[in-house]
C-alpha cells in the first residue's frame, strides 16, 4: 500500500506473493543458513526452490527459518513468500459520521468483510474501510520490515539474556546455544572502548554473573551503555565458532506505591503518543535516521519517553531509544 513500495495500491488485498532470486557464497557451505523476517503482516508461507521451509502467523513479531536443506550453491536460489492478510476483523456498525463520508456500497463491503472475520486477526490502527478515517489509517499488507540471510556454524549462539543487577553492581548473562555444546563461552565487556573485563566460562554454566567496578548508570539524561562481545570457542581446537555483539545499561526500574522508580529515584513519565505511521512508508520508516529523529524530536519537545500505540515497533527504534 505504501508509496515507498513502488506500488501504492490501497485497495483490500487478501493475498500477495513475493519472489526474489539470490546466490550464496561458497564460504557458507557446511553452515546453517537462516532467513530472518523483521515483520510480515499477517500469515505467511515461505518457499525456497519450490520447497516449503516454514510458516508464520503474526504481523508484527520477527521470525527466522532454517533454510539449509533447501538451498544450493551452484546456481540461483528462488525465494517465494505467500502472504494472507485477512483485513477488517470484527463487527462494524458505521456511525452517521462514517455514512457522511463513505457511500452505502463501500460501507456494505467493509461491513461484510468485518463480519466474516470474527476478530480472528488483530489490526491495530489499520483502517477497516478503503480509506483512513478518524484515528485509523491505511493498511499494511505483507513484508514491512527488513529481510536478511545469515550463515552460522552448526554450533552457534542463539541468544543471550542480559539482566543488570544494580544492588550487586553486576550483569547477569543467560546464554542459549543451538545444541547441547560442551565448549567455551567468552564474555568481553567494554565501556566507551575501554576494557572492563574479559572472562571465559564453560558452556554448561547456565547463568553467568560479572561484577562491574564503579558502574556508570543508564538514565534518560545520561544513557550510558556497556558493550559486550560474546564468543563461542571450540574446546577441541580453540576455533571461534560464533561471535555476537550486544550492549546493555546498568539500571534498575521498579514500581512502588503507584510510582515508577529509575535507579531508586522517582521518575515522572512525560510520554508522547507514538503510533508509528509514516506518510510514505505507513508502518515502515523510510530511513534509519527517521526512527532516530522521532525520538530526538519528542525529547526536544519536552518528553522523556513514548507510549508506543497499537504497534510492535522494530528493534532499531528501541536501539536508538537506548542510545
Kindly give the residue locations of the regions a language model identified:
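Active-site-adjacent substrate/metal-binding segments within catalytic domains
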Residues: 2-24, 28-36, 41-49, 54-57, ...
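Accessory beta-strand-rich segments of carbohydrate-active enzymes
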Residues: 8-9, 13-156, 180-181, 305-307, ...
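Beta-strand-rich binding/interaction modules
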Residues: 46-48, 169-201, 206-208, 228
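Signal that preferentially marks extracellular ectodomain short beta-strand elements
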Residues: 65-70, 209-223
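Short, aromatic- and glycine-rich surface loops/edge beta-strands on solvent-exposed regions
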Residues: 78-81, 222-234
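Short acidic/polar inter-strand loop motif in beta-rich domains
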Residues: 84-91, 233-241
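Surface beta-strand/loop "capping" patches
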Residues: 151-181
Amino acid at each position: 500500500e505504501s508509496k515507498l513500495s513502488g506500488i501504492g495500491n490501497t485497495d483490500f488485498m487478501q493475498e500477495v506473493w513475493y519472489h526474489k532470486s539470490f546466490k550464496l557464497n561458497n564460504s557458507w557451505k557446511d553452515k546453517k543458513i537462516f532467513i530472518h523476517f523483521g515483520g510480515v503482516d499477517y500469515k505467511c508461507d515461505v518457499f525456497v526452490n519450490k520447497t516449503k521451509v516454514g510458516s508464520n502467523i503474526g504481523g508484527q513479531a520477527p521470525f527466522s527459518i532454517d533454510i539449509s536443506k533447501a538451498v544450493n550453491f551452484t546456481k540461483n536460489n528462488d525465494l517465494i513468500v505467500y502472504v494472507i492478510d485477512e483485513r477488517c476483523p470484527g463487527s462494524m456498525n458505521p456511525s452517521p459520521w462514517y455514512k457522511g463520508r463513505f457511500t452505502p456500497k463501500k460501507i456494505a463491503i467493509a461491513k461484510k468483510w468485518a463480519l466474516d472475520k470474527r476478530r480472528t486477526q488483530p489490526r491495530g490502527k489499520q483502517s477497516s474501510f478503503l480509506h483512513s478515517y478518524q484515528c485509523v489509517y491505511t493498511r499494511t499488507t505483507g513484508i514491512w520490515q527488513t529481510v536478511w540471510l545469515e550463515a552460522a556454524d552448526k554450533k552457534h549462539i542463539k541468544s543471550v539474556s542480559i539482566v543488570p543487577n544494580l544492588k550487586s553492581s553486576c550483569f547477569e548473562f543467560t546464554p542459549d546455544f543451538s545444541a547441547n555444546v560442551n565448549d567455551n563461552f567468552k564474555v568481553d565487556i567494554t565501556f566507551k572502548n575501554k576494557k572492563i573485563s574479559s572472562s571465559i566460562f564453560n558452556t554448561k554454566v547456565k547463568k553467568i554473573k560479572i561484577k562491574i567496578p564503579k558502574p556508570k548508570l543508564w538514565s534518560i539524561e545520561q544513557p550510558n551503555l556497556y558493550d559486550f562481545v560474546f564468543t563461542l570457542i571450540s574446546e577441541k581446537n580453540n576455533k571461534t565458532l560464533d561471535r555476537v555483539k550486544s550492549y546493555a545499561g546498568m539500571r534498575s526500574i521498579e514500581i512502588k506505591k503507584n510510582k515508577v522508580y529509575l535507579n531508586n529515584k522517582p521518575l515522572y513519565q512525560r510520554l508522547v503518543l507514538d503510533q508509528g505511521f509514516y506518510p510514505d512508508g505507513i508502518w515502515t520508516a523510510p530511513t534509519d535516521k527517521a526512527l532516530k529523529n522521532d525520538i530526538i524530536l519528542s525529547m526536544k519537545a519536552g518528553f522523556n519517553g513514548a507510549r508506543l500505540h497499537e504497534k510492535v515497533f522494530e528493534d532499531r527504534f528501541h536501539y536508538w531509544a537506548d542510545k
